[in-house]
Curated annotation (Swiss-Prot):
Keyword list, A-Z: Acetylation, Cytoplasm, Endoplasmic reticulum, Isopeptide bond, Phosphoprotein, Ribonucleoprotein, Ribosomal protein, Ubl conjugation
Organism lineage: Eukaryota, Metazoa, Chordata, Craniata, Vertebrata
Modification N6-succinyllysine occurs at: K104, K217
Protein name per Swiss-Prot or TrEMBL: Large ribosomal subunit protein eL6
Gene: Rpl6
Organism per entry: Rattus norvegicus (Rat)
Record-stated family: Belongs to the eukaryotic ribosomal protein eL6 family.
Length: 298
């Protein structure tokens, strides 16, 4: 008996070992780390190999086989339930209506007792002629308040090629932008006979050539009003002078001549300091056979 008692604890000790062995048998076998990575990479490849296909095959680029209503039924979009997003907007308080009339009590047995009276009385007299009311402009500003933008390629001192007008094809020096958005340019006059004048930036080609005019002082009175042409007076026919009348001709003022000399005297030394720049400004721009404007580099 003593021997059997000694053997029993051995069996108990073996049972948990058996359970562990049984547990190991049911559990999945451990695989090497490389095998796990390979299996995961294969799964990713399988997922990537299935591209998403549209249920509406394309007949021609931008045109599907089925219409929008047909695809609505094919996708069963009618089964979806849409709920509008809830907004936390406070309800606007209703303004109290201003009463236009007031009921007042009236004495007398035959007057009805009450009478409706307007708070705002109508005018006693009306205008004989209709005066037009000024309508509110919906964000439209007058031309004087428009924003003046200048092309990034046009900076003070840039040599420009004029494309329209009597000086088309000539190269000029840009001085500044005026209040109306027009460009103030000069030839100078001694080189290519282009005086101080205004031109629009749409009809100009900006070149990469520049003249240093940082120290050039431009008179402040050179504005749009300065260059605006004054209307010439037409002479009235008088008795005996029907055929002898002459039209008034435009003449350059002494102020214009003085301003032209003042500006050109400062720019000409800057131009002469750069070799071949005088000849470049004297020459005119023109296109010949085989020259394409969109391929030229100015």
């Amino acid at each position: 008996m003593a021997g059997e008692k000694a053997e029993k604890p051995d069996k108990k000790e073996q049972k948990p070992a058996a359970k562990k062995a049984g547990g190991d048998a049911t559990a999945p076998r451990a695989l090497p780390a490389g095998a796990v990575k390979k299996s995961s990479s294969k799964a990713k490849k399988l997922r990537k190999s299935k591209p998403h296909c549209s249920r509406n095959p394309v007949l021609v680029r931008g045109i599907g086989r089925y219409s929008r209503s047909a695809m609505y039924s094919r996708k069963a979009l009618y089964k979806r339930k849409y709920s509008a997003a809830k907004t936390k907007v406070e309800k606007k308080k209703k303004k109290e209506k201003v009463l236009a009339t007031v009921t007042k009590t009236v004495g007398g047995d035959k007057n009805g007792g009450t009478r409706v009276v307007k708070l705002r009385k109508m005018p006693r007299y009306y205008p004989t002629e209709d005066v037009p009311r000024k309508l509110l402009s919906h964000g439209k500003k007058p031309f004087s308040q428009h924003v003046r933008r200048l092309r990034s390629s046009i900076t003070p001192g840039t040599v420009l090629i004029i494309l329209t007008g009597r000086h088309r094809g000539k190269r000029v020096v840009f001085l500044k932008q005026l209040g109306s958005g027009l460009l103030l340019v000069t030839g100078p006059l001694a080189l290519n006979r282009v005086p101080l004048r205004r031109t629009h930036q749409k009809f100009v080609i900006a070149t990469s050539t520049k003249v240093d005019i940082s120290k050039v002082k431009i008179p402040k009175h050179l504005t749009d009003a300065y260059f605006k042409k004054k209307p010439l007076r037409k002479p009235r026919h008088q008795e005996g002078e029907i055929f002898d009348t002459e039209k008034e001709k435009y003449e350059i003022t002494e102020q214009r001549k003085a301003d032209q000399k003042a500006v050109d005297s400062q720019i000409l030394p800057k131009i002469k300091a750069v070799p071949q720049l005088q000849g470049y400004l004297r020459s005119q721009f023109s296109l010949t056979n085989g020259m394409y404007p969109h391929k030229l580099v100015f």
